[in-house]
Amino acid sequence: MNIPQYITNDEVKRVCKEMKLKDWTKKKDAKVTADEARAVMSVVNTEKMAIPLEAFRRGLEVELEHGTRFNDANVTNNHPVVTGRIVLAHLKETMDYYQRLEVAELEGDLFKAVKSADMQKVAKYFRKLSKAKLELNRLEAKAAK
């Protein structure tokens, strides 16, 4: 099946230019600056939901990772507004969405390391997972107050 490109490079370039962002069609990695995140959030957060800038920035990086790492899974073609709306939708579900996702991904990485009997990777992912769980626990405790 021939799958069309629903969001064209020209459209992404147009939006980036209008938003005064670098051309996101040329992104080689998922890094997003605080200024870029602020610009995107100001466009998509029309209801002025209280979103910490770092949470939004981190979400953009996670969502952009799909396209920068896996070309065949680039849902948004790195379109800043469409990507930002995906982040906003997840944060509306739960503000700790991306911390929960990080824990789940690290649990998967740890499982693969254990399965391969690579003890260096096991130790590395165990440390990362412990840190991610601690951060999530802090967020949950703060939200429970």
Sequence positions of predicted segments:
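Charged, low-complexity interaction regions
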Residues: 24, 49, 71-77
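Generic structural marker for isolated residues within well-ordered, non-membrane alpha-helices
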Residues: 12, 37, 87
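Short linear, low-complexity motifs centered on an aromatic residue
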Residues: 101-123
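Intrinsically disordered, low-structural-confidence terminal and linker regions
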Residues: 1-19
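Long amphipathic alpha-helices with heptad-repeat character
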Residues: 110, 122-125, 129-139, 143
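Flexible, glycine-rich loop/tail regions that form catalytic "lids" or insertion modules at the edges
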Residues: 34-70, 81-84, 96, 107, ...
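Amphipathic alpha-helical packing elements
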Residues: 74-109
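Non-catalytic nucleic-acid-binding interfaces of large nucleic-acid enzymes and RNP effectors
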Residues: 29
